[in-house]
Amino acid sequence: TVIFIISCIVLGFAYYQVTSGINNGSIVKIIYVPIILGSISTFFIFWSLSGLLLRIFMSIKKIYYKGLNSFTLRQFSSKINTTVFSTTIICLMLFITICVLSSALSMKNSLNKNLTDLSPRDIELSKSSNVNLEESDLTDIKKQNLRLNFEEIFAKFGFDIDANFKNTVYFSLYFDDSVTLKSTLGSYYKITKKQYPYLRYNDYIILMTNSDYNNLAASFNLEKVTLKSNEYVVVGNYQEMLNIKNEALKRNTKITLNQKSYYPKYQKAINGFYEMESQKSEVGFIVLPDNALSDDKKIMNRMIADYNGNQADIEAKINSITEKTSFYTDYGLTLNTKKDIRDASVGLGAIVTFLGLYLGIIFLISCAAILALKELSESSDNAEKFNMLRKIGVDEKMINKTLFRQIGIFFMFPLL
């Protein structure tokens, strides 16, 4: 009884740790500890339970001596005693089955939710800015094309942006050599370098003006910000990277741009993104006051919009344009649509769901097979025992009912 109670407490603690006690991705290795504890405690639960159950039911004489209950309970107790290890393995397989199935369904639901939250507009376009037009491999025509804006480029293909798009928002991305991951971490850089030595600390951080971000935030249903002349905010949604940047923000880390210092408005990054996607992958860009960024630091112009009219017709027009290789090569454009993102995500979701169901069903079948083989291996012994019952006058109906109960309890017991 003592072993059973202790094992139940340890098993409960292990399940708590697996489900809610461990929620930090940086300590995921610790998850093996509760799994091992759960396995050991499950073994001792079954080891102690057979005799305990028998004693409990023997004390309840009305149940124990009713019909063939005494025979069924002793048979069940004997089976549990001889199958403690295999029953523990089956419980672990069922645990894995539940984890695989729930994880697959959770991932599918998460992908579907992300499609709604992270791809709120129908189309997005981006165009390189401040390209070095003196590069030798650029033709004269390409140099002229790179100077064109979105409307002028599409007009060349007979497509009117104003007529076919609505809710259009334009914004720009900037960079500065002095604003890198290393510089934005400040004093926290040395600590981060030891923990994550392979991060690309010299990569520059994407910058955006306050007004551009607020226009984008209104379109993407994100939180707007109002900055003072010496403030900045970090915006992103990839939590693992944001956890690092939040530590730097808590230290009031300043960034210097054009010999002027800027300090964080908040002590943690705010949720947001500038590129439509199917998963949260924005590692964090910086929003600065409008006068902090100049056009010579602009690296990309972007546009987001909804279709103004029949979606299929507009997409057909766009596809007829993008099928021409010159659209991308001669104009420095990239294009992405909600439909493209959804199609890619649906494929991934289907694969995840299929694998989850496949593995889950395989484990369930394996569990049933182990129990069935155990029953078959003991069928000769059981036959002799039931023959003895016939000899003492027990009718077939009662024997069949007892056999059904015995097998049913044996198959259902690991699920408890």
Residue map of PLM features:
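Alpha-helical transmembrane segments, especially those used as permease/efflux helices
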Residues: T1-Y65, N69-M107, L415-L416
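Peri-transmembrane interface segments
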Residues: G21-S41, F327-F363, E378-D381, M388, ...
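Hydrophobic alpha-helical membrane-embedded segments
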Residues: S39-L52, D306, L364-K374
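Transmembrane helix boundary and interhelical loop/hinge segments in multi-pass membrane proteins
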Residues: I56, L68-N69, K374-M388
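Basic-flanked hydrophobic alpha-helices used for secretion and membrane insertion
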Residues: L115-I365
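Interfacial transmembrane-helix starts/ends
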Residues: N400-G408
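C-terminal transmembrane helix pair
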Residues: I407-L416
